[in-house]
């Protein structure tokens, strides 16, 4: 069955990558969560997509040049109920405390000075929670990156964690180094698959699972469901759940 992964939480409704966004995703029957991860100046793992905070918070800080305390002082609410920056520790704790079976897909974001350090810090945290072998009865971890060298580094660091090589047509490194680390999962954007649906068969014939991002319209959700995509990554887990239920009833 196609998994529904809440992209940055239920980010179509709540501020992205905040605890309220993931709490709502649980209520909306998501099968898992997606988050980006960056390192702060004091080497803490936080859930932020951009290198700067201006798009999501009330101040403009560079994440890698700011301490966790400085980031925690910002307001990430986007005019909703007050929300703070989320640490990856809080992200994992929320998933474990839910008692639900969840797949956590974690996308690494990098700056040059932290070369390789992010993956090490993340693996240390997963080990602390007993999630580094992917044998937990409820919570499973998947690592994702557009950077093929990040996928390769993590494959050497911890081969027990499945890896997703994210793909988009304008990412030049992927043309030069298409499959370093031999990732088990391919992560194409929905726009790429709509233009080239034959890629799904190609990936499946290679023995790869397919996780598709960011699938937000009912039409695109049905496109994925009809083609047996392994996971839909969406800002609207409630709509994806409704579409999946309707699809399953129609079979």
Predicted regions and their residues:
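Phosphate-group recognition and catalysis centered on beta-loop-alpha active-site segments
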Residues: 1-251
């Amino acid at each position: 069955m196609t998994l529904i992964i809440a992209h940055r939480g239920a980010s179509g409704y709540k501020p992205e990558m905040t605890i309220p966004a993931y709490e709502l995703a649980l209520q909306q029957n998501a099968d898992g969560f997606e988050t980006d991860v960056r390192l702060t100046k004091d080497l803490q793992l936080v859930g932020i997509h951009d290198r700067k905070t201006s798009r999501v918070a009330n101040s403009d800080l560079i994440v890698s040049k700011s301490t966790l305390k400085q980031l925690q002082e910002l307001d990430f609410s986007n005019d909703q109920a007050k929300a703070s920056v989320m640490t990856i520790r809080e992200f994992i704790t929320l998933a474990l405390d839910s008692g639900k079976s969840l797949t956590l897909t974690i996308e690494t974001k990098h700056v040059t000075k932290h070369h390789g350090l992010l993956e090490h810090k993340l693996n240390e945290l997963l080990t602390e929670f007993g999630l580094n072998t992917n044998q937990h009865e409820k919570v499973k971890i998947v690592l994702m990156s557009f950077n093929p060298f990040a996928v390769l580094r993590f494959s050497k660091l911890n081969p027990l964690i499945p890896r997703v090589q994210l793909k988009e047509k304008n990412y030049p490194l992927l043309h030069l180094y298409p499959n370093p680390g031999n990732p088990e999962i391919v992560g194409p954007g929905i726009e790429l698959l709509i233009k080239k649906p034959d890629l799904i068969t190609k990936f499946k014939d290679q023995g790869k699972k397919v996780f598709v991002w960011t699938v937000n319209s009912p039409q695109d959700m049905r496109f994925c469901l009809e083609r047996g995509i392994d996971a839909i990554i969406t800002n609207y887990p409630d709509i994806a759940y409704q579409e999946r239920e309707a699809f399953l009833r129609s079979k």
